[in-house]
């Protein structure tokens, strides 16, 4: 099992009058606008930049024939079949509608999606953790929605302020460490993850010597990964298999970039070896076995 994804289109769709909630009605899939048909034809072509086309489809007004009593139906290519708890769906939908329909920043958000967001798909776990923050009316997630959305969608590096719900558990000279508990059952999309930690550097591009020592101690020496988003993350032993498989889906250029990132040496020798093995096209089963064996010992 690899990381579960959700799409922004699972929550909201664009119409001529603005953004409205998404609905699911396969019977209406047959109705498409001319623009949607052209984009859907282009996404099927060999070598197509599917992520870019998905963003265009998301930012295109849907056919009026796909409106229902509850909202609008996104085209099949930009929605997922992921089961989303109603509590999470309601919280995230209302939050996104406030962001996208804002008179002052709405256009800026759409422009950012087109030019800066890598895709409209994102981690279901990240979305679940944003929903946890939304339950607290005093949380900054209600005022700083655009920036938190951008971090959730990996358009900008995250920090403590833009992460999903977490608790600061340690601060060193060079890092702040946060603990992420399993997501509450009523908000969790997919299977709950175990406890993990993230270390955020005090100064960008500077190694986290004391922070990593603290991270290893707090996490009981869990495997540490750098995903290239400006922080380090621990992975519980039982989740290494999924984590490595998910990381291996990155393209070669991205893995090389992360391998040479200033934070990667702090992640440790096992992480560097994993990157090297993936770049050398080792079988994924071999990579996982080596990482888990060394981690166990």
Swiss-Prot record:
ATP binds at residues 119-121, 198, 227-229, 233. GO terms for cellular component: host cell cytoplasm. The active site is at residue 231. Its cofactor is Mg(2+). It comes from the Viruses. Its main location: host cell. It is found in: Host cytoplasm. Residues 212-247 are annotated as: RNA-binding. GO terms for biological process: viral genome replication. GO terms for molecular function: ATP binding; hydrolase activity, acting on acid anhydrides; metal ion binding; RNA binding. Homooctamer. Interacts with VP1; this interaction is weak. Interacts with NSP5; this interaction leads to up-regulation of NSP5 phosphorylation and formation of viral factories. Participates in replication and packaging of the viral genome. Plays a crucial role, together with NSP5, in the formation of virus factories (viroplasms) which are large inclusions in the host cytoplasm where replication intermediates are assembled and viral RNA replication takes place. Displays ssRNA binding, NTPase, RNA triphosphatase (RTPase) and ATP-independent helix-unwinding activities. The unwinding activity may prepare and organize plus-strand RNAs for packaging and replication by removing interfering secondary structures. This is Non-structural protein 2. It comes from Rotavirus X (strain RVX/Human/China/NADRV-J19/1997/GXP[X]) (RV ADRV-N). The lineage of its organism: Viruses, Riboviria, Orthornavirae, Duplornaviricota, Resentoviricetes.
